[in-house]
C-alpha cells in the first residue's frame, strides 16, 4: 500500500483570487472567517494587505540632484499627483532625500509618505512609522522604497523602478496611484489550517 505524505499543515488563500473564480459575492471577511472555521479548518491568521500597503503611492521623480552635504545621498522632487497632505514647492512637487544609487529623474518609483508604516515592519511589535525629518540638513518627506522595505523581495541595493511592462494589462501609470490597487495587493489573505487534508485517514 502506498504511503501518502502531506507536508503542509496550512495554506494561504487570496480573496482576490477566489473572486476571480466564482460568480457570486463573498460575505464580509469576518463572516467568511467564521464559516471557514466551522466547515474547513481553523483560520490561523487574516492578513490585511491593503492596510499593510495603504500608504504606498506610485510617483514620478521629476528632479534629482546630489545632496550638498552627503556624497551618497540625492535630493529629489517627486510628483505624487497632489494626493498627500505634505509641504510642496511652488510647482507642487514633494522633496524626498534618497540614498539609492539608482535614483534618477524621470523614473517611476514607490513613495512612502510621512505617517505611513514601512510595510516590512507592519507585523512587528512596534512598526516603523515614517515622519518628515532632515537628512544631513535637508528635509525629507518620507522615503522612496526598495523591495525589502516593501516586503516583496530581498533587494536593498536600490529603490524599485517601475516600468511600463511591470504594470498589469489595462492599467495606466498615474502619479499618486495606490501601489496596492495597481498591483492587486488590496486584498485579504487567509492562512487556514489544513484539517480537511492533514486529518484524512489515508
Task: Mark where each language-model region is.
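Phosphate-backbone binding interfaces of nucleic-acid-interacting proteins
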Residues: 6-202
